[in-house]
């Protein structure tokens, strides 16, 4: 009797194990099948190109966005951005006051000098204190000093971030004791991407049957981060390359002798030459157009070596469009130097973008989705 019970128990255990093994195998097969239908997108670009802002927009647009815990995690980041920015402006003002022939306009008031020294010391720390109302009032006083405003106008020479004005105009709210960052604050927050981050989404919603599912990879743009891209190159459906077209008069954070636009040109050329991208589609985002359209009327495009042959033709909106089309053509020429014009297995599209403009980013990704779906249908012989 005991032997029969033992055999029955072993038989039941074997059956359970077989059932579990079959279930695991079924899940693995399902995941492998689902994985085949996920399109891989690689988000590339030099440092400060705005690609990480694009990445955050995708999370807001096509996923659940940021929960309260994630929003709160940006508080120290945003406060650090404030301290770093005001230190850059203060130290830059001191440098201009010492070295410029018209140094008088860079002379701080006695009140600003005292505030500035304290803030510069805080900005040089490894750990920043939480932004308080008292500190924010000091920062606001310093920010409004005419000498700081003169320095800010030369921000391209000092690595002053694009978010400076936004941060300074929101100091009161950012320093509130109960402050929780808004979605807009998170988009403006500057954190250098290190390593690789990824997100999975569908531009048409959660229902995977209604459209393509994409896995988007964002990688560090600074030079020392680029070696981490290599293992991501295989099996990519498309490269989304971000080029900050407003940065034609700026230098790299990591190499102040190198023009940012020249770095972007060389990086784009290098990526195009990679054998693993021979049949990969390229979506070029000419980003930061909002800054470009203001800057190009004041700072000649031909200050950049790549744009030496640019000739202005007009003023106002007409000149902005002329300058934009010139830059666009330069990138097109670079692409076709690396790709035969009659290639049909490699799609190339250019989009004018502003990473902070959510409506524009949404519209752009819908267009990218349509382009890639059409390519898939062509490859399948359905078009």
Swiss-Prot record:
PROSITE patterns assigned: G_ALPHA (PS51882)
Binding-site positions, GTP: 48-53, 162, 187-188, 193, 221, 287-288, 290, 355
G5 motif: region residues: 353-358
Stored PANTHER family: GTP-BINDING PROTEIN ALPHA SUBUNIT, GUANINE NUCLEOTIDE-BINDING PROTEIN ALPHA-5 SUBUNIT
UniProt domain comment: The helical domain (68-188) is required for self-activation.
Gene deletion effect: Hypersensitivity to ABA and glucose (Glc) during and after seed germination. Altered response to blue light (BL). Abnormal roots architecture; more auxin-induced lateral roots. Reduced H(2)O(2) concentration in melatonin-treated guard cells associated with impaired abscisic acid- (ABA) and melatonin-induced stomatal aperture.
Annotated positions binding Mg(2+): 52, 193
Pfam family, one: G-alpha
Residue ranges of every copy of the G-alpha domain listed in the record: 37-383
Lipid-conjugated positions (N-myristoyl glycine): 2
UniProt region (G1 motif), positions on chain: 40-53
Compartments, as annotated in UniProt: Cell membrane
Expression by tissue: More abundant in roots and/or leaves.
Disordered, as annotated region: 1-20
Chain positions covered by the region annotation G3 motif: 214-223
SMART domains linked to this entry: G_alpha
Superkingdom in the source lineage: Eukaryota
MF-aspect GO terms: channel regulator activity; G protein-coupled receptor binding; G-protein beta/gamma-subunit complex binding; GTP binding; GTPase activity; GTPase binding; GTPase inhibitor activity; metal ion binding
Region (G4 motif): 283-290
Name assigned to this protein: Guanine nucleotide-binding protein alpha-1 subunit
Cofactor(s) listed in the protein's UniProt record: Mg(2+)
GO cellular component term of the entry, any: peroxisome
Family to which this protein belongs: Belongs to the G-alpha family.
Keywords: Abscisic acid signaling pathway, Cell membrane, GTP-binding, Hydrolase, Lipoprotein, Magnesium, Membrane, Metal-binding, Myristate, Nucleotide-binding, Palmitate, Transducer
Ranges where the record places region G2 motif: 185-193
Keyword Lipoprotein: yes
